[in-house]
Every structure is written in structure tokens, then in C-alpha cells.
Design a protein with these regions (language model features):
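Chalcogenol-based redox active-site neighborhoods
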Residues: 1-124
């Protein structure tokens, strides 16, 4: 998030023709509002934090975090860490132009299904 905030402040996003940035997470609206505020982006009109409460968008894009062939949280071992029926989205970055996904990068690997160790792979 710090890089995103800096890019907004110094005008790089606007200069690149980016009209809106959406940070989407499988969570509720209250958490997303608090996260935006925590990141110092509460006043931003360019960067919006959006709750995918029931993971509908995540599922439609095929980005549900899974492990051992099962939805995250429904298997044994490390993928059960978030609890039964937990839904999470893979770390992803997309460039969408007029509703068409032009570029989608997912930061994941067999040893890192969430992309936490390689967040730069989901940067455009």
C-alpha cells in the first residue's frame, strides 16, 4: 500500500491514465473501511477499498485460495489455519479497461499459494 499511496500523491497513477484503483478483499465493509484509513488513504478519491463479503467476485474470477484441492480452510494442515469455511482470495493485480480484463497477474507458487512471499509478482 505505501507504494500505491506514493504513486497517487506524486501523480504517477493519473499520468498513466488510471482513473480508479480498487483494493478488493474477501472481508466485510467495516474492515475494508478501517484498512483504508489505516493505510492513510481515507481521503483518497482514486483508491477505493471494496469488500467481497461473500467472495462472489473472487469465485467468479477463479481466484479462491485453495490448498490440497479443497477450498482454503476445509483441509488439514497449514491451509486450515484460517478456520473452517474461511474464504480468501489469491494476491492478484488486474488492469481492467472498460470492463475487460487486459492484464491479470497472480502471485502464487506451489510453496506459497497466497502469494505472501512474492507480492511483487502481482504488481503491474
Amino acid at each position: 500500500m505505501p507504494g500505491l499511496k506514493a504513486a497517487e500523491i506524486d501523480g504517477r497513477l493519473e499520468a498513466a491514465g488510471i482513473e480508479m484503483v480498487y483494493v478488493v478483499c474477501v472481508n466485510d465493509g467495516a474492515v475494508m473501511t478501517a484498512w483504508k484509513k489505516d493505510q492513510g488513504l481515507a481521503a483518497s478519491d482514486l483508491i477505493e477499498f471494496v469488500a467481497d463479503t461473500d467472495s462472489d467476485l473472487t469465485d467468479a474470477l477463479g481466484l479462491q485460495l485453495t490448498g490440497d484441492g479443497k477450498p482454503y480452510g476445509k483441509s488439514t494442515g497449514p491451509n486450515n489455519a484460517l478456520g473452517y469455511n474461511s474464504r480468501r482470495c489469491k494476491r492478484t493485480c488486474m488492469y481492467v479497461d472498460h470492463g475487460v480484463v487486459k492484464v491479470m497477474q497472480v502471485a502464487e507458487a506451489l510453496d506459497d499459494p497466497a502469494g505472501d512471499d512474492r507480492p511483487e509478482l502481482a504488481c503491474i
